[in-house]
Amino acid sequence: VFDFLAIILICANIRHHPQKLRGPPLKTYLVVSDLHVPYHCRKYTKLVTKIIKHIDPDGLIQLGDALDAFQISTYSKDPSRRNLLAEDIDDYKLILNEWSRELKQNAAIHLLEGNHESRLSRYIAGHCRDLHGLVPDWQTLLGIQIRNQVGKHRWHFHPYHKWNSCKIGDCVLMHGFYFNQHVAMTCLQKYRHNIVFGHTHRMQYVSDGVHWACSLGHGSDEKDTAHQPTPTGWQQAIGLLHVDTQGKTKLDVVLVHDGKAVVYGKQISV
């Protein structure tokens, strides 16, 4: 009887202290892909908030194209789209505020510039060169410096064209430049690093036995961001990037469907 009770107590202790099954301590970063505000999926962003509460990560990484910035695109524009870019920036800052409120003290928050955000510098270069240096950059527009001065987190911004600016352990996180059928394999062969990227809105994971690469889907509302009447093959997803004390990284891919996901064996939904 005593042996049986001892086994029950041990199992209960492990259940309530899952870190005892993990071995050496890990840091975990929540990785969020393309949002395309104002065409983001509201269920997706709320789900991210809920997952932050559930896993208490050490940081958050947004892979770029957080904003759609259609207003300054060179492509033809839907006349029914009437949002101002300033309004979209404010909406994205509200999302960041919601996520950061749930993150622990001194969490690292990395915001990457995507090709959609880089439209701002391209627009200035192409249409109003004389305003170069007068229009605020994205770090200013998103209040990165102010957030670092008065907030409880460490905020970082990574320019689009510095592909290896954001590195966590032995993993490079980038927005992405390629857009072909087997894009994860393309990036693996090109960079020869562990790589997580967005851009394509598709979920692909590939490994050569030494390194791995992952195209981490998206978090947008597909009916608003897709520009084709046929199926896209897109997939909403979230990444959990784990890094050990030696800087070795592993990635858990969490697929998202209609505001639902399974994280560490538990279904979370909004």
What are these regions (language model features)?
Residues 1-40:
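Acidic, histidine-bearing metal-coordination/catalytic regions of metal-dependent phosphoesterases
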Residues 17-18, 46-49, 96-98, 159-162, ...:
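A generic local structural motif
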Residues 23-29, 165-172:
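Beta-strand-turn-beta hairpins that frame and shape the catalytic cleft
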Residues 28, 32-147:
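Core catalytic region of metal-dependent phosphoesterases/phosphodiesterases
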Residues 108-115, 158-162, 252-256:
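Acidic carboxylate-rich catalytic motifs and surrounding loops in phosphoryl-/glycosyl-chemistry enzymes
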Residues 132-170:
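Metallo-beta-lactamase
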Residues 169-255:
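Conserved beta-sheet core of the metallophosphoesterase superfamily
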Residues 253-268:
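Polar, enzyme-active/binding microenvironments
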